[in-house]
Amino acid sequence: MALLQISEPGQSPHPHQRRIAVGIDLGTTHSLVAAVRNGVSECLPDAQGRVLLPSVVRYLDQGGRQIGHEAVAAQVWDARNTIASVKRFMGRSLKDVARAGQLPYDFVPDAAAQGMLSLATVAGNKSPVEVSAEILAALRQRAEDSFNADLYGAVITVPAYFDDAQRQATKDAARLAGIPLLRLINEPTAAAIAYGLDNASEGIYAVYDLGGGTFDISILRLAQGVFEVIATGGDSALGGDDYDAALVDWVLQQARRQASTPADRAALRIAARACKQALSATDIAAFSADISCANVHVDVRRADFEAITADLTARSMAAVRRALRDAQLTRDQVQGVVLVGGATRMPQVQRAVAQFFGQPPLTNLNPDEVVALGAAIQAHQLAGNGGNAAELLLLDVIPLSLGVETMGGLVERIVARNEPIPTAKAQDFTTYKDGQTALAIHVVQGERDLVQDCRSLARFELRGIPPMVAGAARIRVTFAIDADGLLSVSAKEQGSGAQAHIDVKPSYGLSDEQIARMLQDSFATAAQDMKTRALVEARVDAERMLSATQSALAADGEMLSARERAAIEALMATLSAQREADDAAVIEAATEALAQGTQAFAARRMNRGIRQALAGRNVQTL
């Protein structure tokens, strides 16, 4: 009979050794899988020793497919069926896809998900979720082959600026790939985990993450194993692909050529990427591509490349400045800058970062691998495998404020941007009209004061509110955001217990323009927004005062003399005329005048109510 081996708690030499947990960096250009082995986080190679898996999937007729390296070459001669950079399409609608006309794909509406896009291939229409699932499945297989065991779970990284739709699409892709998802974490946060544990870093750090398709900047406070993201920013339509596209446009202009077919565009993109990478090591490199029976050959100087892409680098640095402003920090307070993403190898990027912060960026770890390495450490912890990672505390934040619409089209923020997640916040609201039995709740996202300037996330209704006078009901609205950044909203009437709930799963993501514009607009229009909000609030208060006074007159008007009633009605007429004025102070003055003019009436009503409540009662019964 086999004997059980018993160890002291936490002292087993190989606790949970069969829990194979990995970190996956699902990237725009390349994807990686990493795991902690023998206490060290490392990327897992394929059979040929390659750790980078090109994020490319080629669909064949009869249901076949090629994934990764074997699909890369087909981008030139089978561009329509060879899908690259699919991460840029996750959670997006057709109208959200920038430069769709320049891409070699046939975009069609997704029949299964209203508002979403799919890509037409020889194997049928494929959604970005399905394409991403192919890449994830290949990485899962690599991990299981490496350990010769089934996968327990994975932590998958996403850009910090991914919204709810894009995060949900990533979770769906993991499920489709057969991967038990332990958690989604932000890519910059994963990089901080890797650097923090490897170097025992403490203090304020910036993580500058320029990948193939997205740019993220995160400001983090690292102290004694606690990773707190205190500000985030970025651009979901800025990455290495955009540098490639700018180079292609410039080369075609120099060569006086045009890309007339999808195969031409694919060949030019591949040549641009190779030229860009060469220019990181040399001052001049050849751009060479065969298109439409002609060869395009241009010698590109690094200075030329930096000039034509200067605006892209400047866009990233503008986001860095905004993130520091959000964190209420100066660049001098940042102890170090971590570079993430293969695009950060470009000299102009490293130079811009160094000049801005006044110090060279950290490059201890491979920028292509650092995100996967950090995700693997987090997965190791979540799987219960112990080690130093067991003491790690991770605090991500939400990138944009969340709130609800109130009267007058104003936004009442419930969860402020840069709030650490997971979190739950609640706020009490009330009814606006007498006898109101339902409340429409409109959930919005953004930094502006007016609903029309923010992004609508969801709408739902709370019904079954007992009829009562305006302002008597107490409705608690709760926002709960899980560790993956996904939102659920509930509303409950405190007296009756009536409640409603919704999981916010928007049908499409933010457009490229919206993401770049939302924060910029909030700063540029702050003063005007404040003035507009004050005006709307004054009008709402005036309307509420008029409605309450009208109800009081209808219920207890006989308590007033004709002269008193006429005085109140005159004040009401003045307020009614002034409430459409464009000056909040004028409206507030008229509202206050009516409030003062009805004080005696309100006191009489209160006294009558008390007398009626006490009628027939004595001290003992009270």
From Swiss-Prot:
One of its GO terms (molecular function) is ATP binding. It holds the Pfam family HSP70. Disulfide bonds: none annotated. Keywords: ATP-binding, Chaperone, Nucleotide-binding. One of its GO terms (biological process) is iron-sulfur cluster assembly. Chaperone involved in the maturation of iron-sulfur cluster-containing proteins. Has a low intrinsic ATPase activity which is markedly stimulated by HscB. HAMAP family: HscA. PANTHER family: HEAT SHOCK PROTEIN 70KDA. Belongs to the heat shock protein 70 family. This is Chaperone protein HscA homolog. The lineage of its organism: Bacteria, Pseudomonadati, Pseudomonadota, Betaproteobacteria, Burkholderiales.
